[in-house]
Amino acid sequence: MEGRGIRKTLTGRVVSNKMDKTVVVAVETLVRHPLYQRTIRRTKKFKAHDEENACRIGDKVKMMETRPLSKEKRWRVVEILERTKQI
């Protein structure tokens, strides 16, 4: 791990796992409106690499920034923090 810079980590919910070894993770952030000072919930979707296809929809995951793996994929799933119940 030496020689690498500090990598960003994000936490979010899996919203899609239809692709092979790829999941779509929605990351929610709270920001203040510049004029009205109201707290707004912003959501951004990231494509993340899931090597074992272990993630299910609704799982809470931690992902880390990595080298570009495809046109849109620059994140990889590090761990599954919370599992959803299987129906």
UniProtKB/Swiss-Prot annotation:
GO MF annotations, alphabetized: rRNA binding; structural constituent of ribosome
UniProt signal peptide: none
Gene3D superfamilies: Nucleic acid-binding proteins
GO biological process, one term: translation
Disulfide bonds: none
Gene Ontology CC annotations of this record: cytosolic small ribosomal subunit
UniProt keyword rRNA-binding present: yes
Keywords per UniProt: Ribonucleoprotein, Ribosomal protein, RNA-binding, rRNA-binding
Matching CDD domains: Ribosomal_uS17
Lipid metabolism found in the keyword field: no
UniProt superkingdom: Bacteria
Free-text function comment from the UniProt entry: One of the primary rRNA binding proteins, it binds specifically to the 5'-end of 16S ribosomal RNA.
Xref: HAMAP family: Ribosomal_uS17_B (MF_01345_B)
Family assignment from sequence similarity: Belongs to the universal ribosomal protein uS17 family.
Subunit structure of this chain's protein: Part of the 30S ribosomal subunit.
Name this protein carries in UniProt: Small ribosomal subunit protein uS17
Gene that produces this protein: rpsQ
